[in-house]
Amino acid sequence: MSEEALQACLDRHLEHAAMVFMLDDELGTHHGLLWADFVLLTVLDAAGGAAPATELARTLRTPASHLLLRLLPLEKTGLVERAADGDGKRRVTLRPQGRRLLHEARDTAVDACAP
């Protein structure tokens, strides 16, 4: 990798970090959510409100152990539910409270992402 390519990667990372910081602040202030929580809930909602945990981890491009760390507080606050499906695998379901909060937070995210 050339120095220019490395610098381009570092610049992209810092831009991404700044965006996440701003979105964490906006969503946290108004809805008590982190950007990562919002993304997870959005992906779950787009999957029809429920998905196997392994599929969710794959879609989010995160290890299953990291997904579990994200899910535990969301489950504790009643936004999602984890349960074994018929195959003994874990299935994650977006609860009504989570769907409501997601739809409320969507306007904040749209406003924050607007140029």
Task: Outline where the language-model segments fall.
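Residue-level detection of beta-strand scaffold positions
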Residues: 38, 62, 67-71, 82, ...
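N-terminal leader segment of winged-helix/HTH proteins
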Residues: 1-31, 77-79, 94-96, 100
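Short, Lys/Arg-enriched charge-dense amphipathic segments
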Residues: 3, 47-65, 79, 104-113
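N-terminal helix-turn-helix DNA-binding core of bacterial DNA-binding proteins
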Residues: 21-66
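Residues at secondary-structure transition points
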Residues: 3, 7, 31, 35, ...
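Charged, amphipathic alpha-helical coiled-coil/dimerization segments
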Residues: 72-115
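Basic amphipathic alpha-helical segments that dock to polyanions
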Residues: 41, 56, 71-77
